Amino acid sequence: MSSLKDKSSASAAERQERMAAALAADPGHKTWSWRGIQTILITLCVCCCSEDAGLDGAVMSGINAMKQYQSYFGMSESGAQTGIVFGIYTIGGLIGSFPAAYLPDRFGRRAPMFFGNLVLIVGAVLSATATHRGTFIGGRLLTGIGMGCANTSAKSYLAEIVPPQTRGFWVGLFNSLYYIGQMSATGMMVATGRWTGNQLAWRLPLYIQAVPAGINVLFVYLCPESPRWLYANGRKDEARAVLAKLHSGTNDHYSPVVEIEMEEIEEKTSLDGADKRFWDIRSLIRTASDRYRTGSAVMVGIFGQLSGNGMVTYFLPVLLGQAGITSQDKKLTLTFVNSVTSMVGALIGSAVIDRLGRRALLLGSTTMLICILGIIIGLLSSDGNSRQANAGIAFSKWRVLITSVLF
């Protein structure tokens, strides 16, 4: 097993050296050239999928704290019905992951984004116009299905379309746009939450959730198809043309950068069975290095969920109430501050990841996160101490910042 891992590591190191030499010969487009701007626009269109996910978490967290929403549906901040409303979205995301496994290989990477965001728009409108709790929950289910389908494909598409030398930054930016959506929603709800007696206070944010999805639906088919999908479906010349247009500074179809990327695509496609058998997971566990990478990816996903970030996002107003903050306006304001802190952390992470490396950033951020969580536990361990509670809330912002850098 160790020999296989060593061989894989040597091959990866050799490939990195070849890529570094290729990038020295052809560094790609400048950021503000037309092709560079085109890459930015493609990325922003794809990142609408991430922004929608951020909007949803923040919108539900915010409206769950609004008296207008609670009285209309007869809900409480943390009752069983509230758990169903939050949980049904997660179930929808799980359902949406199944078409996300099939559609990208059958119809291309853009199709699941288009389909998923259409479903999301229907779900958002259904939730925003709901007059019964069941209708509202149904809208939440559709929103989750759309999100699960679109978001999964968006990440793989982005990693396959952006230049290799800035891939870490762009994928990090994808995660950062989650917090842009979160910040937009929480900032808006600070204002709408003050509309006493007006049902638009909670309905308007749900409508706004459909905006990024609508942008993606309108423009995603103006973006080029993934070169990996084109190659896997016998359209090798088109795959080379896309790589040359976006990754070569001279639009050279036989640039050393393009040649290396075509070799990588050919190698993975031949190993994975033409990239078409979505049910075949043997490529994930075929060799020791494959199992090592798969295990690492699974563990990062588990750690991301167990960090508590999702739970804190949804139930932050409840946690603030337990810390002694009862004002609806102050809860919404602190939720907005939480979103700003998250965005700052995500931007820092995306900016430094290509310089510090994935592993160093992961281990360093995890260590700091453990220390800060320990401090928060100590500060919030005593009931009735307002000073300790306020200090705990302050340190929780640092926890959010570091979690955003990490994940």
What are these language model-derived features?
Residues M1-H247, S270-F407:
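Alpha-helical transmembrane bundle of multi-pass membrane proteins
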Residues L246-I260:
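Short intracellular "coupling" helices and adjacent cytoplasmic loop segments at the cytosolic face
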Residues V257-A274:
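Cytosol/matrix-facing amphipathic helices and coiled-coil assembly/linker segments
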